[in-house]
């Protein structure tokens, strides 16, 4: 998932493909997914189980403008001037949803 989110490199509030990817994974893991939370198309809340304790996990998966980069150890943009992941949100988002996997 992290590699796919890296390739999507979608800016904040525009992460349609990334959000869909994460939500589909959670549904396959038997989570109930509520989409479009607080009027934000890409925001979602996924729940599973009941009772206590309640555990909440935040997943961020937005990219930053102007930082397009192929997954190589030297500067090589995927798209000149495009967006990219420079602070690990592709990993953060994927790991956050994977933390709830069964």
What does each model-found stretch correspond to?
Residues 98-102:
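Flexible, small-residue-rich helix->loop connector segments that border functional cores
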Residues 1-85, 90, 94-97:
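Acidic/His- and Gly-rich active-site-bordering loop/insert found
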């Amino acid at each position: 998932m992290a590699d796919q989110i890296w390739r999507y490199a979608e800016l904040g509030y525009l992460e349609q493909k990334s959000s869909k990817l994460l939500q589909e994974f959670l549904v396959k893991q038997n989570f109930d997914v509520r989409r479009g939370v607080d009027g934000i198309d890409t925001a979602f809340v996924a729940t599973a189980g009941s009772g206590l304790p309640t555990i909440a996990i935040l997943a961020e998966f937005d990219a930053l403008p102007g930082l397009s980069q192929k997954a190589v150890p030297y500067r090589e943009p995927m798209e000149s001037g495009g967006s990219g992941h420079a602070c690990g949100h592709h990993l953060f988002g994927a790991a956050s949803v994977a933390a709830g996997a069964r």
